[in-house]
Amino acid sequence: MRGFILALVLALVGAQKHDLEPVFSTGKTYLYDYKGLILHGLPGKGLAAAGLKLTCRLEISRVSRSDHLLQIENVFKVANKTRHHKKWIHSRVKAAVTDLWEEPSATPLSSSSSTDSSAEGEEPGNKRDKDEIWQFGKKYGADSSSSSSSSSTGSGSSKTCSSSREDSSRDKHCSVDSEYFNQQADLPIYQFWFKPADEQDPRRKVQNSSISSSSSSSSDEGISTPVSQPMFLGDSKPPVLAAVLRAIRRNEQPTGYQLVLYTDRQASRLRVQVFVSSITESDRWKLCADASVVNSHKASGTLKWGKDCQDYQVATQIATGQFAAHPAIQVKLEWSEVPSSVRKTAR
């Protein structure tokens, strides 16, 4: 610290006399600016600790003012030259990579950079390398630009593809997507409908139309029931099965359920009706099920329950046929209202 203060005082005195007095300090390196002040005084480290790219130590003992300024100028010139040289190497490589994909009309290097490099002692081989890099970039840059322009114009889509190296992968996807879009646009559109098996045979179609109402599984008119069949088989048929489930409690009315089954079998048709009702006089809850087989390819059924079988209703129809060239089964369901518990179970 004392040596630093002593050097500062001597520098100020030397600046006034236009001559610098010798500064002696063990293990220290001093650098004076043009005013005679101490710019750096770092013990044992010299100018390298101040950010200057020098490997030698600089010790100033007794120099004149003109020599002092000349030395400082040379020091900063050497330091700036080192940093500029490294930056120029980085920029040269970066420019070489960029020039590979730029237009060939761009100038490879400016005149100022070439003069600076020659003044800084550039070797003759570096110039030859730059020329080779430029020729390489000129060749492949032209090829890439021509190929990208041909691919963008030949795709036939409204999407344009750039010719930069960063977007080269995206350009490939662009061309692939355009080709795929064109291929998909040329594909035909097919519409397949379910064809019931009973409608494919004209004789069977006429037979079915004579015994049932016009109901087609491929239409959206809904599920219909045969008009020729009676609504209640008990009007013309005796029950096939009757069962009663009864529970009796003390001092209470008997409770239970009654089940009645009716069937009607004909040549190619079968109809079944099931009725379940409560035996309690005050309870009017009933369940009514009606299922019929129209032919060997179609069956339908309805299920009603609630008060006098009028609260809830579900209708279904099952038909076999073909979908395109494959055998298939079509199932239709219709309901007006169902309990919330049934909806939760279905979900």
Curated annotation (Swiss-Prot):
What SUPFAM superfamilies is this protein classified in?
Lipovitellin-phosvitin complex, beta-sheet shell regions
The glycosylation sites are 80, 208
Provide the GO MF annotations for this entry. Answer: lipid transporter activity; nutrient reservoir activity
Region annotated Disordered sits at 104-174, 200-234
- What does the UniProt PTM comment say about this protein? Phosvitin, an egg yolk storage protein, is one of the most highly phosphorylated (10%) proteins in nature. Cathepsin D is responsible for intraoocytic processing of vitellogenin.
Q: Does the keyword Metal-binding apply?
A: no
Q: Which UniProt keywords apply?
A: Disulfide bond, Glycoprotein, Phosphoprotein, Signal, Storage protein
Which SMART domains does the record match to this protein? DUF1944
Tissues of expression = Produced by the liver, secreted into the blood and then sequestered by receptor mediated endocytosis into growing oocytes, where it is generally cleaved, giving rise to the respective yolk components.
Q: Which residues form the signal peptide?
A: 1-15
**Bias-annotated ranges (Basic and acidic residues):** 124-133, 164-174
Instruction: Tell what triggers its expression.
Output: By steroids (estrogen).
What InterPro entries does the record point to? Lipid_transp_b-sht_shell (IPR015819), Vitellinogen_b-sht_N (IPR015816), Vitellinogen_b-sht_shell (IPR015258), Vitellinogen_b-sht_shell_sf (IPR037088), Vitellogenin/Apolipophorin (IPR050733), Vitellogenin_N (IPR001747)
Residue spans of biased composition, Low complexity class: 104-118, 144-163, 209-219
Keyword Phosphoprotein: yes or no?
yes
**One Pfam family it belongs to:** Vit_b-sht_shell
Matches recorded under PANTHER family: VITELLOGENIN 1-RELATED, VITELLOGENIN-RELATED
Briefly state the protein's biological role: Precursor of the egg-yolk proteins that are sources of nutrients during early development of oviparous organisms. Phosvitin is believed to be of importance in sequestering calcium, iron and other cations for the developing embryo.
The protein in question is named Vitellogenin-3
Q: Which organism is it from?
A: Gallus gallus (Chicken)
The gene it comes from is VTG3
